[in-house]
């Protein structure tokens, strides 16, 4: 089983880095091969809204006018069985690194063939060869977990990325909050490891 870890953390140490390590270890303990894509270290340009990917509805990965690392990244994602997606929360959303990546996936991993009611051009995943699975991790410095609904758009964004771009069902989420004041809790570390392990226990479906 191949798990791709999508890491939008700009820092290599700290609470989110610890949770990412725990989730990766959990997946490895379950027998998965884990490949980390550290987005901050890769060349990912802003979407230029040229619509090249939007118009390309036939390719396994939508063509892009930019020559950066995204095509290589998307090929790694296409080969995966499952994903660990992690971002710090910034102004309630995924951070700028995550959102740049999110936008670039919309019609490259996704296709414009989707439709909701009478609305056409809705993203739908190109990765239709098998059902994939995902878990998400978000960290926040100020907002406590019990007030998560007030600021955690990041988890919603990660779940949308999983479903619309990667054809992945999100089977678990973690939001670790109030880290600036109370630090990382042991229960969140355990939860992260459990999330990673849970990916290896999901039933593969064509």
Predicted regions and their residues:
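Phenylalanine-focused residue identity feature
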Residues: 49, 98-102, 127, 133, ...
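Short loop/turn motifs at secondary-structure junctions
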Residues: 33, 79, 130, 167-170
């Amino acid at each position: 089983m191949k798990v791709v870890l999508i890491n939008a953390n700009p820092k290599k140490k700290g609470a989110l880095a610890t949770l990412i390590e725990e989730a990766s270890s959990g997946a490895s303990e379950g027998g998965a091969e884990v490949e980390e894509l550290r987005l901050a270290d890769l060349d990912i340009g802003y979407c230029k809204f040229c619509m090249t990917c939007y118009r390309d509805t036939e390719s396994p990965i939508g063509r892009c006018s930019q020559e950066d690392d995204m095509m290589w990244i998307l090929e790694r994602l296409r080969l995966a069985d499952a994903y660990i997606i992690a971002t710090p929360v910034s102004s309630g959303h995924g951070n700028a690194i995550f959102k740049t990546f999110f936008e670039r996936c919309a019609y490259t991993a996704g296709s414009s063939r989707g439709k909701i009611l009478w609305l056409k051009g809705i993203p739908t995943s190109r990765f239709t060869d098998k059902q994939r699975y995902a878990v998400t991790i978000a960290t926040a410095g100020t907002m406590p977990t019990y007030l998560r609904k007030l600021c955690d758009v990041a988890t919603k964004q990660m779940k949308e990325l999983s479903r619309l771009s990667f054809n992945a069902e999100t089977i678990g989420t973690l939001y670790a909050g109030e880290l600036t004041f109370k630090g990382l809790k042991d229960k969140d570390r355990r939860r992260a490891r459990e999330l990673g392990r849970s990916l290896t226990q999901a039933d593969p479906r064509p």
